[in-house]
Amino acid sequence: MVDTSNVKLRIENIVASVDLFAQLDLEKVLDICPNSKYNPEEFPGIICRFDDPKVALLIFSSGKLVVTGAKSIQDIERAVAKLIQKLKGIGVKFKRAPLIDVQNMVFSGDIGREFNLDNVALTLPNCEYEPEQFPGVIYRVKEPRAVILLFSSGKIVCSGAKSEADAWEAVRKLLRELEKYGLIEEEEEEL
């Protein structure tokens, strides 16, 4: 059985797509979003930043958004609610409640032990390691779909997960593989 008691994971970023079910006049939206940029020749949406919650929103005339920089699902929900309140203030009508779809969650973590990445790369399936290009092993998990970057220090970055549960499952799969191939040594007992 894989022991995850020493493993720590922390959310670094959540990216979500959102459908507001409303058409938006971006020139009017620009007036209600003080920390924003809009240059339609370069990009078809408004780039808007909120300080609380600290997120960035890409706002499109179709009523679709991309929210990034969130540290929790609640941050995304709060940012969307905040934008909706501002949009109602300029007369935007919504056909229904917004639909929020998490696209990607990025976690940083620590497995709590060091690894010889050459051994890991030579032994573990579904991984890549090019130390001249990147100092970590890239391990791909098929289900749930995620990518884990494993560094010799035992630090990890997990991206592509759509939930915290998926990230933990991906990490457990990596640990099972490391254990299966003898790449995790048992801790020596203190005398």
From Swiss-Prot:
Q: What are this entry's molecular-function GO terms?
A: DNA binding; DNA-binding transcription factor activity
Which NCBIfam families does the protein's record reference? PRK00394.1-2, PRK00394.1-3
- Role this protein plays: General factor that plays a role in the activation of archaeal genes transcribed by RNA polymerase. Binds specifically to the TATA box promoter element which lies close to the position of transcription initiation.
What Gene3D superfamilies is this protein classified in?
Answer: TATA-Binding Protein (3.30.310.10)
Q: A Gene Ontology biological process annotation?
A: DNA-templated transcription initiation
Question: Where do the sequence repeats lie?
Answer: 11-87, 102-178
Give yes or no: UniProt keyword Transcription regulation: yes
- Record organism: Pyrococcus horikoshii (strain ATCC 700860 / DSM 12428 / JCM 9974 / NBRC 100139 / OT-3)
Per UniProt, the keywords (alphabetical) are: DNA-binding, Repeat, Transcription, Transcription regulation
Family membership noted in the UniProt record: Belongs to the TBP family.
List all membrane-crossing ranges: none
Any Pfam family the entry gives: TBP
Q: Tell me what this protein is called.
A: TATA-box-binding protein
Its encoding gene is what? tbp
Q: What InterPro entries has UniProt attached to this entry?
A: TBP (IPR000814), TBP_archaea (IPR033711), TBP_CS (IPR030491), TBP_dom_sf (IPR012295)
SUPFAM superfamilies given in the database record: TATA-box binding protein-like
